[in-house]
Amino acid sequence: MDLFFAYMFVASATPLFLWLEHRKIALASIPFIIVMWVLALAHIFDGFLFDLHHSAFVTAFLINVFIAHFAALVLYVYPHLRSKSRRFTQSTE
């Protein structure tokens, strides 16, 4: 649970990094972050949502993992690849 809790803080900060350049992705991730935190609190205070909260928490967590990794690719990898492709096309001309 410690790993989940640590990643929940990282996932919660993801919209802050995306806000200036990719607002649609940032806004799309906010509902999943809210659901993830509600389900985590339901897990801490056991019995809130019975057995449904286990599978829903894992689903919300995995969606947030996907969004955070997609955001990292968009923010860091795509600009790097784009600059390399520009240099490659300029060198072949």
Swiss-Prot record:
Pfam families: YwcE. It is a multi-pass membrane protein. The keyword Transmembrane applies. One of its GO terms (cellular component) is outer endospore membrane. The chain crosses the membrane at residues 1-21, 25-45, 57-77. Keywords: Cell membrane, Germination, Membrane, Transmembrane, Transmembrane helix. InterPro entries: Spore_morphogenesis_YwcE. It is found in: Spore membrane; Spore outer membrane; Cell membrane. The keyword Lyase does not apply. Required for proper spore morphogenesis. Important for spore germination. Belongs to the YwcE family. This is Spore morphogenesis and germination protein YwcE. It comes from Shouchella clausii (strain KSM-K16). The lineage of its organism: Bacteria, Bacillati, Bacillota, Bacilli, Bacillales. The gene is ywcE.
